[in-house]
Amino acid sequence: MTITYTSQVANARLGSFSRLLLCWRGSIYKLLYGEFFIFLLCYYIIRFIYRLALTEEQQLMFEKLTLYCDSYIQLIPISFVLGFYVTLVVTRWWNQYENLPWPDRLMSLVSGFVEGKDEQGRLLRRTLIRYANLGNVLILRSVSTAVYKRFPSAQHLVQAGFMTPAEHKQLEKLSLPHNMFWVPWVWFANLSMKAWLGGRIRDPILLQSLLNEMNTLRTQCGHLYAYDWISIPLVYTQVVTVAVYSFFLTCLVGRQFLNPAKAYPGHELDLVVPVFTFLQFFFYVGWLKVAEQLINPFGEDDDDFETNWIVDRNLQVSLLAVDEMHQDLPRMEPDMYWNEPEPHPPYTAASAQFRRASFMGSTFNISLNKEEMEFQPNQEDKEDAHTGIIGRFLGLQSHDHHPPGANSRTKLLWPKRESLLHEGLPKNHKAVKQNVRGLEDNKAWKLKAVDAFKSAPLYQRPGYYSAPQTPLSPTPMFFPPEPSVLSKLHSVTGIDTKDKSLKTVSSGAKNSSELLSGSDGALMEHPEVSHVRRKTVEFNLTDMPEIPENHLKEPLELSTTNIHATLKDHVDPYWALENRDEAHS
């Protein structure tokens, strides 16, 4: 059985733990009193022999042996060995408790998913939950001595109502040399599938949820079976037991009080009762007894699990949930807080002291002075570092100082401040220096800068950067040219459209590179890098002659080589191409 003392330590008060020392059931005294009396008896027998039965020479030999044992007794790592062992045992003990099968979730699913108020529906639900309880009992009687004493055979399970005679015969037909705790779970799965095929379970998702919960309980039963089969290695238990008992066997000799007249170091007092030796025995052997009791919680000790109570409780609760409580709901009605947005449940006189306001945060009650709540100018506005994109990337700071209070748009227009302020003024900079200062003082340059910022195109605004698109592959994408585009290409000066190769004609002082597409598809200039080299092609689009009516309009054949042609000097800048209308392209 389990010793529960939770209510006695609910409040940490003076003597709350001390009162637990007076308990006997499940206490360390009940586990330790036998070994302690044996140790006490052996200690005083050795003391009596040393004092009364030995001669002077024999006493001298015994005293040397005592000093030797006392000096080397600390070499036994009893605390280290016991600490790891008890930690392992307690962890294993709690894991076994977490794997105890509780059918509460499964019975809720069976009661809600398996429909039917008729006799067949009731039989189906009760049979399903009885199979779950039968699987739990079969595994518990395999690992718990208390449950096995209650149900020593399968016939006892039939008499107790966990299994019908037909199911018992079906179980005996299997005749496998293994534990049969898994058989009821197979019956449960097949019966659930039959209920779904018969329309008792509406949706296959509900069937899957039911089988998932069944598998969870089946897994817990398998874990209990594995914990019972695989114990803590015997060698570890033996090492811990030998270390503890050999330590205190040595203490029987090494902790004896010697004759004070012989002035041995540490033996100035001749005490009858070795208090600290007895306390050490109480702690270390008691520590070992804790591991001995928790190593198998399915026994009959005071702190073992209440397995028989678990069997009774699970059967009673689960049958009630799937039978009498199926679709037996109370009438719905508005609660007492129906029209209250913030319900306030009442407190009794004994619990009124525990009423607390809602916690808003640890900084909720902090108060600041009025001066401390005023915003200060940002450090950026004071320093006003104005760097380009490369300077910002390299961490460089500008030495230009902008006036405080400038917003983000006026900061971007700061490089153009001088040109905006000097627009329409004489070229003599010294003559208009005072006027510029006056404009700065009156912040007139800001208004003019904002107007210029709004009226300027997007590509001319400071801070606008247009990066070319990076191709995803070295092979350029090819789009068939439209007729309108072909007509424009025919009108480009310096290109012979009748030729199959695309060539640029140099005019004036402009130097143009040649882009040829030969029959072999290689570039004429540096063919070894033709697959990665980009050529610059110049087109003169300033004077575009009209296309004659009798001009041959034939498709322009492009070369098959990997070439990216980039317009370099166009009469319109690149931003004009970006902002052009789709209809006029």
Swiss-Prot record:
**For this UniProt entry, what is the primary localization, expressed as one broad class?**
membrane
Cytoplasmic face residues: 1-31, 83-237, 289-585
- InterPro entries recorded: Bestrophin, Bestrophin-like
- Where in or outside the cell? Cell membrane; Basolateral cell membrane
Query: Can you tell me where the transmembrane regions are?
Result: 32-51, 61-82, 238-255, 275-288
Q: Which GO terms describe its cellular component?
A: basolateral plasma membrane; chloride channel complex; membrane microdomain; plasma membrane; presynapse
Q: Name one Pfam family in it.
A: Bestrophin
Function recorded in the entry: Ligand-gated anion channel that allows the movement of anions across cell membranes when activated by calcium (Ca2+). Allows the movement of chloride and hydrogencarbonate. Found in a partially open conformation leading to significantly smaller chloride movement. Upon F2R/PAR-1 activation, the sequestered calcium is released into the cytosol of astrocytes, leading to the (Ca2+)-dependent release of L-glutamate into the synaptic cleft that targets the neuronal postsynaptic GRIN2A/NMDAR receptor resulting in the synaptic plasticity regulation.
Notes on the domains: The C-terminal auto-inhibitory segment (AS) modulates the open/closed conformation of the channel. In a closed conformation, the C-terminal auto-inhibitory segment constricts the channel concentrically by wrapping around the channel periphery in an inter-protomer manner. To allow chloride movement, the C-terminal auto-inhibitory segment opens partially, leading to significantly smaller chloride movement.
**The protein's name:** Bestrophin-1
Identify the species of origin.
Answer: Macaca fascicularis
Q: Which gene encodes it?
A: BEST1
